Amino acid sequence: MSEKNEIYDESQIQVLEGLEAVRKRPGMYIGSTGTRGLHHLVYEIVDNSIDEALAGYCSHIKVFIHKDNSVTVSDDGRGMPIGIHHKMKKPTVEVIMTILHAGGKFGGGAYRVSGGLHGVGASVVNALSETCEVEVKTEGHIWKQTYHRGKVASPFEKIGDSDEHGTKIYFKPDPEIFEDTEYDYDTLSQRLRELAFLNKGIKIELTDERHDKNEIFHYEGGLKSFVSYLNRNKEVVFKEPIYVEGSIDSNYSVEIALQYNDGYNENIFSFANNIHTIEGGTHLAGFKTALTRVINDYAKKFGYLKENDKNLSGEDIREGLTAVVSVKLTEPQFEGQTKTKLGNTEVRGIVDSIISERVSTYLEENPQIGKLVIDKALVASRAREAAKKAREITRRKSVLESTSLPGKLADCSSKDAEECEIYIVEGDSAGGSAKQGRNRRFQAILPLRGKIMNVEKQRIDKILNSEEIKAMATAFGGGIGKDFDVSKLRYHKIIIMTDADVDGAHIRTLILTFFYRYMTELISEGHVFIAQPPLYKVTKTRKEYYAYSDKELEDVLQDVGGKDKNTDIQRYKGLGEMNPEQLWETTMNPEQRTLIKVNIEDAMAADEIFTILMGDKVDPRRKFIEENATKVVNLDV
């Protein structure tokens, strides 16, 4: 994979098509014009620098967020080619920056492996920026060109001399295109850290001039460091992650690191050419198949399983597993426009053979670790058998079997899942108000008694014995865990409605932890919402006003002429304090209510937060609370 092509010049830049469509349909190129698309601009430019690193020419990438939310990305690579393009008869830098699909990623000349999104990077960023500047240091000189909304604003010219080499791109996202142009430091740092883990030895520096923050991501341990980082708030079963690597000629390289923790969830993150393949693909399938076979072969060879014993299932073997699977290949095939599933069929066998050989060898050379892995899988296997019976209870019942729905569920009359919504409400008093205030045609109410089980600390067999969890799983209709099928949901909106106090927040977190661990698609496919009941009711001269925050309360008081003896302010402690009409009007009426949609922008970040908040380790939880306490808007003491 390290084979180099020393010459990177204008002859290696191929042009496929023009740039006109990008500003008209930005979503086609960067996914959206919301915050995700905004951050994607940075990733596109950084990906180009990473490609230089993978080719062996770049070791240091710098990213600056400036005070006005413009961004500069620089690297110490070879620098963009500065000659005149053979076909376009323009400076090659100008071709790369102004013509879609012009890049060194096509034809295989400049880069063996590339992670940029279809090679559209630089030109798309330029098209969607109010201002863009490119500075290239190469061949002893510094060259520069500026652009305005994708069009050339100054000629490509030499502006000085330098012994250094590399490319620097400055851009200011266009407010005419993006709904919001403010960058989130944590979002960028998460991705840049990920890239540094995936490309060991590379140094990526992030500087935020708005808040005077700076971080350097540099991991000589690569994927081993990545897995240790992912497990840092968990109790690990063995100290050092297992690491294996292998390659097939210069076209495929495979790296895998894995480590077990004492939890019950599997967390496997797969990447192809540095792109997080959220939907998995052939590399992930090859890893799972090989790991299951290797562990079973080892268990039989060393007497942990008798000849007639049933094999351990993949699910048993992956309980508590944290792993990162990274493949790099010259011609990746990504399925779907989102580029999140690797489709190359040959990769499955390549990953399988490398894992089979290297992990088998590792376990035989480290029998104490082999024993720890097998023991954990055997305990998981026994728990899975115990869970089988309980799981059957929660499988989806058809409409004809609706008598098996939980007794406390007040169902809606409509059977059209798309229009139906279910409110998860804490306590019977709030449940009573919600049942009376709802629209019975499409709104169902499921009251829960007290706090549900913390699933972060329990195995599936115990979880399936919890009455509250059984009630939710049966009411929703999609099943639970590996049996969960989002297409069988009975309601397309699942709305968590809890009191606006600390207890309410805790119950909400417990419910979300359960959804994230055992019904992930509920969240990833956009079915989970948080209701926003008002915090205050203001009554003045027989008129009622509702405020959903302290700021809104100030605004309401200002609108009604200030607070005086005729002003009554009621602070709602719980949903039960509202009568059915008020609850409908403020929190349940689709015409007036506010709902917060829950999504998973980043599975790793979500896993980390749930581990910290709901796991056993006290220190990380204390640190998280201390760091985030200032962000709390409402806190009852």
Swiss-Prot record:
Protein name as annotated: DNA gyrase subunit B
NCBIfam families on file: gyrB, PRK05644.1, PRK14939.1
InterPro entries: DNA_gyrase_B_C, GyrB, HATPase_C_sf, Ribosomal_Su5_D2-typ_SF, Ribsml_uS5_D2-typ_fold_subgr, Topo_IIA, Topo_IIA-like_dom_sf, Topo_IIA_B
Residues at which Mg(2+) 2 binds: D499, D501
Positions in coiled-coil regions: none
Role according to the record: A type II topoisomerase that negatively supercoils closed circular double-stranded (ds) DNA in an ATP-dependent manner to modulate DNA topology and maintain chromosomes in an underwound state. Negative supercoiling favors strand separation, and DNA replication, transcription, recombination and repair, all of which involve strand separation. Also able to catalyze the interconversion of other topological isomers of dsDNA rings, including catenanes and knotted rings. Type II topoisomerases break and join 2 DNA strands simultaneously in an ATP-dependent manner.
Cofactor note: Binds two Mg(2+) per subunit. The magnesium ions form salt bridges with both the protein and the DNA. Can also accept other divalent metal cations, such as Mn(2+) or Ca(2+).
Record note on quaternary structure: Heterotetramer, composed of two GyrA and two GyrB chains. In the heterotetramer, GyrA contains the active site tyrosine that forms a transient covalent intermediate with DNA, while GyrB binds cofactors and catalyzes ATP hydrolysis.
Named cofactor requirement(s): Mg(2+); Mn(2+); Ca(2+)
GO biological process, one term: DNA topological change
UniProt binding sites for Mg(2+) 1: E426, D499
Name of the gene this protein is made from: gyrB
Protein's organism: Clostridium acetobutylicum (strain ATCC 824 / DSM 792 / JCM 1419 / IAM 19013 / LMG 5710 / NBRC 13948 / NRRL B-527 / VKM B-1787 / 2291 / W)
Record's catalysed reaction(s): ATP-dependent breakage, passage and rejoining of double-stranded DNA
